[in-house]
Amino acid sequence: MKVSVIGGGHGCYAAAVDLTEKGHEVTLWRRDKDLLKSLQDKKTISVLDARGEREVEPASITDDIEAAIKQASVIVIPLPATTHEALAVLTAKLWQDGQVVFLPPGTFGSYIFHKAARDAGNQADVTFAETGTLPYLARKRDTHLVAISGYATRLPTGMFPAKNTDYAFALLQQVYPSIEGIEDALSGALMNAGPIIHTPLILMNAGPLEHFEKWDIHNEGTQSSIRATTDALDAERIAIREAFGYAAPHFPLADHYDAERDEWMYGNVGHEKLHENRDWCEDISLTTHRYMLEDVELGLAFLSSCADYLQLDCPLTNGLLAIGSAINGRDFKQSGRTLHSLGLDQLDRDALKELLHEGL
């Protein structure tokens, strides 16, 4: 299948490599012309995983976004949610009937891309799919090398609009066999693991993160008090899902930490792979890193807004959001991605359900 991968980050390189090795005709698009030329000159991406190190050559590497979009049946956008608004405008007029666009994870970016297309006058029947995590535990070690320490085994995925679920699922499953269909894109957004795992890890490790040059939040930074906080925060996420009427499995993050529980998104050994790999011993800025700007400011703010919409009390969600706001000197409830900022908070439950199913 013709697949395009949009972006040049960790997950983008991993996707380009993985999907090429699965036999798809992959185009990798990235904006940075200098880094793009370096890749084009080399023609291959180096990958290091459990199978060893090797070179993989995507079919095409380009900075032509129109060409990348128009040639593909499936477009994968494994970029931080902080890129969504600008990218949605850039691509709004390019989508074509029958395409499936995969946002792993989405933070309800599916609606942002769909609305941008409609605002640009594009009425193409496109499906925007989103899931709860990247399909890869991956880190770029240099311009040409990506290390992949784990591959997702379960990707609960919702479609926008949900009326296209059967068609989109059948197409996307050819690219990612690990996807599992769920109710709709909002259900997919509420599977997002980033705000649950990263928010306590960075806020409760703020001291060592700012003191040491590098700190591993998944090893030394994961202690019993932080795990207890993560479980309590996840309980609020699951309560939000249940209040919206979404069914189990809710993929509780506790499954990620305990191989004896149900299989989580990265399988039963996902956390052990994080422990074994020191690629996550990083310099994490609490004002610029995506764990704050994507997972807290956008992702946790979105959860908070869903709780407000449902009139559901989520004190830990709001408390952690307030701490992130204090560190950064701005109110994440105002600056973040919320149902209010998306113009959806005035819809009643029936109207929201219809929007999720039918689109605009």
Residue ranges and their predicted role:
Residues 1-50, 67:
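NAD(P)+-binding Rossmann beta1-loop-alpha1 motif at the extreme N-terminus of oxidoreductases
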Residues 183-190, 208-222, 246-247, 252-257:
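An accessory alpha-helical subdomain
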Residues 179, 205-238:
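A conserved active-site cap/scaffold subdomain adjacent to cofactor or substrate pockets
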Residues 23, 58-59, 72, 98:
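Short, well-ordered alpha-helix to beta-strand connector turns
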Residues 227-360:
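NAD(P)-dependent Rossmann-like dehydrogenase/reductase catalytic/cofactor-binding core
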Residues 76, 81-144:
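Rossmann-like NAD(P)(H) cofactor-binding subdomain of soluble oxidoreductases
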Residues 113-214:
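Rossmann-fold dinucleotide-binding core
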Residues 52-71:
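Short acidic low-complexity segments
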